[in-house]
């Protein structure tokens, strides 16, 4: 194994591919008990790890990992492998090979996310259900060129091995990726393609250059991009897989001789086109539909005229519409880019999207049935217009072709009417065909793009086909998919087990054949062999009258009980019906054969196909061109539809042909298998279900593959190749210089190598190796080569160094020589003679040098010329060479293509020969059958002639019967009451039938072909046999049959009375009779030939029997009609019952709503008006339905009487036949011998005929039963009618009661309104006081604790206060002076604040009114709220008004009730609309309710404040009681309080009574409010938070103000004058409290939390009473001390009263202003939100307007373009006119016409058309003149006329187009005007809202500023009050001290 350093090349994928070194070392060192460590069988986990505890007598006791101890048999335990084999990469290397070892190895590797594992010769992969980093580019690079044993298991390793085998073995390879659906086949296929596309170009200097204008990406990019495109159109979500391939594909990647990527092609199989129109609930259609609707490319939505909601399209919304693991938006981008990379033109790309959109629109096309016809007609044309537009078709032609297709009858075409269901089936078939042909065409285009014409030598095929599928509903598609997997599994088994072992025997290796039990031939033969499932299916498709039932019967007859793989499924509850089961290798699958014949024949509407062929969309016309399916062009085996022509090739036949071609391709390659496994059914990463994985391992033959890999010799190599490759291991073993056989050489070579010699065997042509040995030899070879190369490198390096050393020595010697010469030269350089030599030497050679230079120049010029010539020749030769090479390549490609074509032609020839043989055999069969039919036909013709003679005689009798029947019908019409007497008449008829039974038996024996009348025939035969008493044996037989018939008759009579209600059994028996009829028809044909020897009298009886049979058939037809009518009546009755129950429930709901009339609105009044009209219409419809039911009952009675009359007619015929037969009795005696021989045959058919007779009688009884049931239905309807009248009266009474209740409520409402107004006023006053006190609280909060301590000290010092009171007089006077000054200043400030607050209040009120007017404009019914938004009871008044209106309408409710019952369905729609309006109005009511809740919150706050005030008042009274002088005044206060208490108690009692009276009404209102509240809560959450925050702030302010007020009161308690003021305050507080309580009780009645508030009020009253009791206790103390402080208190009280009044006024104004500010802020916020909403609407409308304007501009541009085109036409016309000088006038007219078109579009059509016509007339007249004058110009004039006509047509087209554009422009202009008007209105509203908002904001800021100033002034006043309070305490202290 590789070390961690070596695994580093895999990057972050290393831990997901192989165990680390640390883990391997730990596994090797882990203790292991080989004897006791075992796997044991477990019921839940299949196998669990255990430890052996003991072994006894074949039993083993083990302890599992879970700690449980079990005892099992010896054969139920399996030894565990040592720890070093944990997570082993190749399971073939394990010591103990068995199921648990394989299972746990896979499980442990899966837990470590090692999803790939070798299993002998193939690879097993487990779906991880998550992304793992094992496919990164560095992983691809790491696997390139690695041997299998050198790298961890991976799909890249399999791919690289296949690539290397292709290069070394020169053999085509294939990779078969198989497994069940959802196992990960598609992902692994993509990785294989990714690997080949990467390695095949890695290392190249440049990539393949794309052909200009054809490709937009390189070849490898296109190969990779083909996958997302095919996945988008061919993959879908299934139950088991979110990205399941719904088609199979075989991708061949072609390589050149050097391994370079050359080209690729794709073959597809079995596209599941039914998914286009139908999906199961947990599945969805193909990804492309949802990608388009993801809105990632909005231009597609606009182009395809679709929406982004899949539920708007029926074809794609039957299951799920989203997949969590798939991002449809990103996938759309990938798909779109793949289309571009693959070189699709823009038109082709648009066509793909348009056809996909057209398929979606097909699913929305609606059709309905014409009245009184079964013919279908379109139900709206909007969808059809869209679909036709996308397909460039005419919408009317498309609808006409769908509803009235033309079919060929003989040599003529006739128009055929279609039913609604037939039209829907046709639309679905067309949608599926378009999608399938488009998909196959895309594959063809992809193949064309991937075919680069480069030389290719080998290919690697990758097979990815749909996995084995077992659904709840399995159809023909599942059978084809499962059959394909069966064939692939058989191929795997055959390759792994059979071929492997056969090759051993062929090579002469000693081998004992092992049967692994993996043969799947039985199932395959059951499906594909002659008389198999496909064969029977194709045979049934040849017969026009074949049905699914006949197909099922043939399957049962041929295979049920004869083949173990064919079973009859057991019916399962909750699952779809199954007709047969097949035992596949992966499990038993139940198949439903519904619709198989149509799917196999794949019929299409030929008329619509003809439209497709003429479509303006080239792609669509190409798909349906020439009646050939697109798959014929795709070049690959594809599923496709049927092929037109004589062969009538079905879907199953084409599928088998393609499958056989695929198997042939696979057999010609060297396969590599990859087995994909599903770990669990829940798609949970890391979880593995043992039983599921074991099942797949067993089915896939994984264990058997490992065993044969271990036992067999999976590696083999030819002797010559082995000798050539491995000779290097021991070259001395093979002698040099002499010939030696390759086999002997291989034997010597292997014998001389140090290996295990039992691991290989020698065959005749190959040497075979066990697994792993060849890898060992490769390693030895690599080591040997490394040694040899090392030695070679050493020798080479030594040689090179010796050469280099020699050169170095030579250079050394040269250097020495040069140095010697230089030294010598330096010595003689200055010698005079040497100088002279230097001067003379050049002169001696200068002349020779000049000559040489001249010669050299000449030679240079010549050489230059020759070089130029040679260069030119070289270039010419190079060009020729390039051309020749190109021709050579072209010829090679041509030869290769011709060879491929020849091979394909040979294959087709073979197939045609096979087909010819099959067809010849079929022709022989058909010919023989035709001859038999001709013989039978001849016989029947002769019989027919005889029967026609007899028919003439019988017609007279029939006429008489018809006259009788007419009389009976007249009597029946006259007396309908005879229906009740039918039982008596039937009894009489039964007696008549009993008399004629014998005659029926005679006819029955004579004619077996008369199914329903054979009973009478047998009776006749029995009568004849009784007459022949001389023949004893025959008489005994006939008497026995007579007795049986009598018993049968008695049984039939009893059964007739018992089976009156068995309608379902009768229907089943009718089906059986029809089946028996078909069988009897065939038998009767044979019997007719046997009866040919009977005399002419029997033939007469046959004629009579034929007439009777016709009558019986007519009766059966009438019975069926009666049954259909009864079923229709039942359906109508059920519908009426349903409507009645729905209306009853609706009435109950309405009655409940009427009881809750308090919440009714004006919208409900309008809804009631509508319902009144609908109710009247419903009453009329009900009466019409009643009349119709009565008429239907009368019709049924009439038809029943007709059937009875016809039976009487048959009886009369039988009587006449009886008379005739009695006359011929003597003649028939001679024929009894012949008849006796036929008795046995007749008796066999007797049972079937008896059953037929019983069926007829049952049908007769059923008719009676149905008639009685119809009468009972009429009675029930009458009872219902009476009951409805009763209910109507009851409702009238209830309405009267409601009216009285409403009037009472109205009176109560007025009282409540007054009370609520009073409450509102009081609340405002208290709110003002709270806000004023809030400011004081802020400044006094820090003194609160101190004041409380001082208060306690003051209570302790009460006695001292009395002594110090006298001393404080002087200080009190001083304090009074300061206090007066402060009070005056504070009064002025408060007056100023009051003015500002009044101004702010007025502005706030104006703002509220503006906002209310905005709100009221939303609905007409809210107009009354414009000036009353501030009033909290506005909505209650409006509801009461609506209630009063409803009371008035209630009086006419009886009429409304009847009308509602007839118009229930329409009423539901209106009800929903009215409910929406009611919810809108309830929203407004809820807003008012929120305001109420706010007021209640304020009320609760006030109550708490009042409680605190009362507590503090009690404290004050305790302090005041120290005065003790005013006890009498306090007693008066007590009396007054008692009086107020009694008044409050009375008010509370009155409130409780009125509360109980109104409680029911409020509860009902609360229910409606609660319903509305849930919808509005989320909208007002933000506002509620703001309001709550403001409430909390106000509460804190109020509390602080209250504490401040308490401190003020305590500071003034020292003065006796404060006492009376405090008493006055107390009285005022009590009065306000009483008013507040009464108002709270009244408000509680209208709100949800009324009772709670009432309890709070009661508690408040109790607190007041307790406060009064406290006051009583303090009276004595107050009286004793009051006299001392009276004088001072009076003076202080006067000043304090004045200040207090000013303070209260200012506080009320301040509080009122704060409340107004808050309301203003809230209204302003809502107004801003409204403004934002309006701005958003305006922006949206502006966007829409811009789009519309843009469309108008486009239309104008089109019009201009049309004008331009018209101008061009005129110019062309002018050119034509120039050919003759006489056409100049026409030219001017046309030019003038074109100019007019340019200036006025409206007049373009008329001017161009009229001008064109006039010019044509003039031109034709002029041409006739010119023909006589100028013969030479005749040809040109004719051409001019032709051109003029052409231009005339184009001008007409342009004028028509111009007119259409003009209309569009006008329509768009109108729409633009309307939208502009709306925009202007919105703008005005927005501007008004903005102005109002700005005004309100300014007012708000101003008021806020004033409020801040008032607060500052209040703070100053409070500080002064605090100073006075301190001084008051000092005075108080002094007074106490003095006392």
Curated annotation (Swiss-Prot):
What name goes with this protein? Answer: Myosin-4
| Coiled-coil annotated residue ranges, if any | 843-1939
Q: PROSITE patterns annotated for this entry?
A: IQ, MYOSIN_MOTOR, SH3_LIKE
Task: Give residues where Pros-methylhistidine occurs.
Answer: 757
Subunit structure, interactors included = Muscle myosin is a hexameric protein that consists of 2 heavy chain subunits (MHC), 2 alkali light chain subunits (MLC) and 2 regulatory light chain subunits (MLC-2).
Q: Domain remarks in the entry?
A: The rodlike tail sequence is highly repetitive, showing cycles of a 28-residue repeat pattern composed of 4 heptapeptides, characteristic for alpha-helical coiled coils.
**What segments bear the compositional bias annotation Basic and acidic residues?**
1128-1147
* Residues involved in ATP binding: 179-186
Q: Which family does it belong to?
A: Belongs to the TRAFAC class myosin-kinesin ATPase superfamily. Myosin family.
Where does this one sit in the cell? Answer: Cytoplasm, Myofibril
């Amino acid at each position: 194994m590789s070390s961690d350093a070596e695994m580093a090349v895999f990057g972050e994928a290393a831990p997901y591919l192989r165990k680390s070194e640390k883990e391997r070392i730990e596994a090797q060192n882990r203790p292991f008990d080989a004897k006791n460590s075992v796997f044991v069988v477990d019921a839940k986990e299949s196998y669990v790890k255990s430890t052996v505890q003991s072994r006894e007598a074949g039993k083993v006791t083990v302890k599992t990992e879970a700690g449980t101890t079990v005892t099992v048999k010896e054969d139920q335990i399996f030894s565990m492998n040592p720890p070093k084999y944990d997570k082993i990469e190749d399971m073939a290397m394990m010591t103990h090979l068995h199921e648990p070892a394989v299972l746990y190895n896979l499980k442990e590797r899966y837990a470590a996310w090692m999803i790939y594992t070798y299993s002998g010769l193939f690879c097993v992969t487990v779906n991880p259900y998550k992304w793992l980093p094992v496919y990164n580019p560095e992983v691809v690079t790491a696997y390139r060129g690695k041997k299998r044993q050198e790298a961890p298991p991976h799909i890249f390793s399999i791919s690289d091995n296949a690539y290397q085998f292709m290069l070394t073995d020169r053999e085509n390879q294939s990779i078969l990726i198989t497994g069940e659906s959802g196992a990960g086949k598609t992902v692994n296929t993509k990785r294989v393609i990714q690997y080949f596309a990467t390695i095949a170009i890695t290392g190249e200097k440049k990539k393949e250059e794309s052909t200009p204008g054809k490709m937009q990406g390189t070849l490898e990019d296109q190969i990779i991009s083909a996958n997302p495109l095919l996945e988008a159109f061919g993959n879908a979500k299934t139950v088991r897989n979110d990205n399941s391939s719904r088609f199979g594909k075989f991708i061949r990647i072609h390589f050149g001789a050097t391994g370079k990527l050359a080209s690729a092609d794709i073959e597809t199989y079995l596209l599941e086109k039914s998914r286009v129109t139908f999906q199961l609930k947990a599945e969805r259609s193909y990804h492309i539909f949802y990608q388009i609707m993801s809105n990632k490319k909005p231009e597609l939505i606009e182009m395809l005229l679709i929406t982004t909601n899949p539920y708007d399209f029926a074809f794609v919304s039957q299951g799920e519409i989203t997949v969590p693991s798939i991002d449809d938006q990103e996938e759309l981008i990938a798909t779109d880019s793949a289309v571009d990379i693959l070189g699709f033109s823009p038109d082709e790309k648009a066509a793909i999207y348009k056809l996909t959109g057209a398929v979606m629109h097909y699913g929305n096309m609606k059709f309905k049935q014409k009245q009184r016809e079964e013919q279908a007609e379109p139900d709206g044309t909007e969808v059809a217009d869209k679909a036709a537009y996308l397909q460039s078709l005419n919408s009317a032609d498309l609808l006409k072709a769908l509803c009235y297709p033309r079919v060929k009858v003989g040599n003529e075409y006739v128009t055929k009417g279609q039913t609604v269901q037939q039209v829907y089936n046709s639309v679905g078939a067309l949608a599926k065909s378009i999608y399938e042909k488009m998909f196959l065409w895309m594959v063809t285009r992809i193949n064309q793009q991937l075919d680069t014409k480069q030389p290719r030598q080998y290919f690697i095929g990758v097979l990815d086909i749909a996995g084995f599928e077992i659904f709840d509903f399995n159809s023909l598609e599942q059978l084809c998919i499962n059959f394909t997997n069966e064939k692939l599994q058989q191929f795997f088994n055959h390759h792994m087990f059979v071929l492997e072992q056969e090759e051993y025997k062929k090579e002469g290796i000693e081998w004992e054949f092992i049967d692994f039990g993996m043969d799947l031939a039985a199932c395959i033969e059951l499906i594909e062999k002659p008389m198999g499932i496909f064969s029977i299916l194709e045979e049934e498709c040849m017969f026009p009258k074949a049905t699914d039932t006949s197909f099922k019967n043939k399957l049962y007859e041929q295979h049920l009980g004869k083949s173990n793989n064919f079973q009859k499924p057991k019916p399962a509850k909750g699952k779809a019906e199954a007709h047969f089961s097949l035992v596949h290798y992966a499990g038993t699958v139940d198949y439903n054969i519904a619709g198989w014949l149509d799917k196999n024949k794949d019929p299409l509407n030929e008329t619509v196909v003809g439209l497709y062929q003429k479509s303006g969309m080239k792609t669509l016309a190409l798909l349906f061109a020439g009646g050939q399916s697109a798959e014929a062009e795709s070049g690959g085996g594809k599923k496709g539809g049927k092929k037109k022509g004589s062969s009538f090739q079905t879907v199953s036949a084409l599928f088998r042909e393609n499958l056989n071609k695929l198997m042939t391709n696979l057999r010609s390659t060297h396969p590599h298998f990859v087995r994909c496994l599903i770990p669990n059914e829940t798609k949970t990463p890391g979880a593995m279900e043992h039983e599921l994985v074991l099942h797949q391992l067993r089915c896939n033959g994984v264990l058997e593959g490992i065993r044969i890999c271990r036992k067999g010799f999976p590696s083999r190599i030819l002797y010559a190749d082995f000798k050539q490759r491995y000779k290097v291991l021991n070259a001395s073993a093979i002698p040099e210089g002499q010939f030696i056989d390759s086999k002997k050489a291989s034997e010597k070579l292997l014998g001389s190598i140090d290996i295990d010699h039992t691991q290989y065997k020698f065959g005749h042509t190959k040497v075979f190796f066990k697994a792993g040995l060849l890898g060992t030899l490769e390693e030895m070879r690599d080591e040997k080569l490394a040694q040899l190369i090392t030695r070679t490198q050493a020798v080479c390096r030594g040689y090179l160094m010796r050469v280099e050393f020699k050169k170095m020595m030579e250079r050394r010697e040269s250097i020495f020589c040069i140095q010697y010469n230089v030294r010598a030269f330096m010595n003689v350089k200055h010698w005079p003679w040497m100088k002279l030599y230097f001067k003379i030497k050049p002169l001696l050679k200068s002349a020779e040098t000049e000559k040489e230079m001249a010669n050299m120049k000449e030679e240079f010029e010549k050489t230059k010329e020759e070089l130029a010539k040679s260069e030119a020749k070289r270039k010419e030769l190079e060009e020729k060479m390039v051309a020749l090479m190109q021709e050579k390549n072209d010829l090679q490609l041509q030869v290769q293509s011709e060879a491929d074509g020849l091979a394909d032609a040979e294959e087709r020839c073979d197939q045609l020969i096979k087909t010819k043989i099959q067809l010849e055999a079929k022709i022989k069969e058909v010919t023989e059958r035709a001859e038999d039919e001709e013989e039978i036909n001849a016989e029947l013709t002769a019989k027919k002639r005889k029967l026609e003679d007899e028919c003439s005689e019988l017609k007279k009798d029939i006429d008489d019967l018809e006259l009788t029947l007419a009389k009976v019908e007249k009597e029946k019409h006259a007396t309908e009451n005879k229906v009740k007497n039918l039982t008596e008449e039937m009894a009489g008829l039964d007696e008549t039938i009993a008399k004629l039974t014998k005659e029926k038996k005679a006819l029955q024996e004579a004619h077996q072909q008369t199914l329903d009348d054979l009973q009478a025939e047998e009776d006749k035969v029995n009568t004849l046999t009784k007459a022949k008493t001389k023949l004893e044996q025959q008489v005994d037989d006939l008497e026995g049959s007579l007795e049986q018939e009598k018993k049968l008759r008695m049984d039939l009579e009893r059964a007739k009375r018992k089976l009156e209600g068995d309608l379902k059994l009768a229907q089943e028996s009718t089906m059986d009779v029809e089946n028996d009829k078909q069988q009897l028809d065939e038998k009767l044909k044979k019997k007719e030939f046997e009866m040919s020897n009977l005399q002419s009298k029997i033939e007469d009886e046959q004629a009579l029997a034929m007439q009777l049979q016709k009558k019986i058939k007519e009766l059966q037809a009438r019975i069926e009609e009666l049954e259909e009518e009864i079923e229709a009546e039942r359906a109508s009755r059920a519908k009426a019952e349903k409507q009645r129950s729905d209306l009853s429930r609706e009435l109950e709901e309405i009655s409940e709503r009427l009881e809750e009339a308090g919440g009714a609105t004006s919208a409900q009044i309008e809804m009631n008006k509508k319902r009144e009209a609908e109710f009247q219409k419903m009453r009329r419809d009900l009466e019409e339905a009643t009349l119709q039911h009565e008429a239907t009952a009368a019709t049924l009675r009439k038809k029943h009487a007709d059937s009875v009359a016809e039976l009487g007619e048959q009886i009369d015929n039988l009587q006449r036949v009886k008379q005739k037969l009695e006359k011929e009795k003597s003649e028939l005696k001679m024929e009894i011998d012949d008849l006796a021989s036929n008795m046995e045959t007749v008796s066999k058919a007797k049972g079937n005929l008896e059953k037929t007779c019983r069926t007829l009688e049952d049908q007769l009884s059923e008719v009676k039963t149905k008639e009685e049931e119809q009468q009972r239905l009429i009675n029930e309807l009458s009872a219902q009618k009476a009951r409805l009248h009763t209910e109507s009266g009851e409702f009238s009474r209830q309405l009267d009661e409601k009216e009285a209740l409403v009037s009472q409520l109205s009176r109560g409402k007025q009282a409540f309104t007054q009370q609520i107004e009073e409450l509102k006023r009081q609340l405002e006053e208290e709110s003002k006081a709270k806000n004023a006190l809030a400011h004081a609280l802020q400044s006094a909060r820090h003194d609160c604790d101190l004041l409380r301590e001082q208060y306690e000290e003051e209570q302790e010092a009460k006695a001292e206060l009395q002594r110090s009171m006298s001393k404080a007089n002087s200080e009190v006077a001083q304090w009074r002076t300061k206090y007066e000054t402060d009070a005056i200043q504070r009064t002025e400030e408060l007056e100023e604040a009051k003015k500002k607050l009044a101004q702010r209040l007025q502005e706030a009120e104006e703002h509220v009114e503006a906002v209310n007017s905005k709100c009221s404009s939303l609905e007409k019914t809210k107009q009354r709220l414009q000036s009353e938004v501030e009033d909290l009871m506005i909505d209650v008044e409006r509801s009461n008004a609506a209630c009063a209106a409803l009371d008035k309408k209630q009086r006419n409710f009886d009429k409304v009730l009847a009308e509602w019952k007839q118009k229930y369905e329409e009423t539901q729609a209106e009800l929903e609309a009215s409910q929406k309006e009611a919810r809108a109005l309830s929203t407004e009511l809820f807003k008012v309710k929120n305001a109420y809740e706010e007021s209640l919150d304020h009320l609760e706050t006030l109550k708490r404040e009042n409680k605190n005030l009362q507590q503090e008042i009690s404290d004050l009274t305790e302090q005041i009681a120290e005065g003790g002088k005013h006890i009498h005044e306090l007693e008066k206060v007590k009396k007054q309080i008692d009086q107020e208490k009694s008044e409050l108690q009375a008010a509370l009692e009155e409130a409780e009574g009125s509360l109980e009276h109104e409680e029911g009404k409020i509860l009902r209102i609360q229910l409606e409010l609660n319903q509305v509240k849930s919808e509005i809560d989320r909208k007002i959450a933000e506002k509620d938070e703001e309001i709550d925050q403001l409430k909390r702030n106000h509460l804190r302010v109020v509390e602080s103000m209250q504490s401040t007020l308490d401190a003020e009161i305590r500071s003034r308690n020292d003065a006796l004058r404060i006492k009376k003021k405090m008493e006055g305050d107390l009285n005022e507080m009590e009065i306000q409290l009483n008013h507040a309580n009464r108002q709270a009780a009244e408000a509680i009645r209208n709100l949800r939390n009324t009772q709670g508030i009432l309890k709070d009020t009661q508690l408040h009253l109790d607190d007041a009473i307790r406060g009064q009791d406290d006051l009583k206790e303090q009276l004595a103390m107050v009286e004793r001390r009051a006299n001392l402080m009276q004088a001072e208190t009076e003076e202080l009280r006067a000043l304090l009263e004045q200040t207090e009044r000013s303070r209260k006024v200012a506080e009320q104004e301040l509080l009122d202003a704060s409340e107004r500010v808050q309301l203003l802020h809230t209204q302003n916020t809502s107004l801003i939100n409204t403004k934002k909403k309006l701005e958003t609407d305006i922006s949206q409308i502006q966007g829409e307007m811009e789009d519309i304007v843009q469309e108008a501009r486009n239309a104008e541009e089109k019009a201009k373009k049309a004008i331009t085109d018209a101008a061009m036409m005129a110019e062309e016309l002018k050119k034509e006119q120039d050919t003759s000088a006489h056409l100049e006038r026409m030219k001017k007219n046309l030019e003038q016409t074109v100019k007019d078109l340019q200036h006025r579009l409206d007049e373009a059509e008329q001017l161009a058309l009229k001008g064109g016509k006039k010019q044509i007339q003039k031109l034709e007249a002029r041409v006739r003149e010119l023909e006589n004058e100028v013969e030479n110009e005749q040809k040109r004039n004719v051409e001019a006329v032709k051109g003029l006509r052409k231009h005339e047509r184009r001008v007409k087209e342009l004028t028509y187009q111009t007119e259409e554009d003009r209309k569009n422009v006008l329509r768009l202009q109108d729409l633009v005007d309307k939208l502009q008007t709306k925009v202007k209105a919105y703008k005005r509203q927005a501007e008004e809202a903005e102005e109002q908002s700005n005004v309100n904001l300014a007012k708000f800021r101003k008021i806020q500023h004033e409020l801040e100033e008032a607060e500052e002034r209040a703070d100053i006043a409070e500080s002064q009050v605090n100073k006075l309070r301190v001084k008051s305490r000092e005075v108080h202290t002094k007074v106490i001290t003095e006392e």
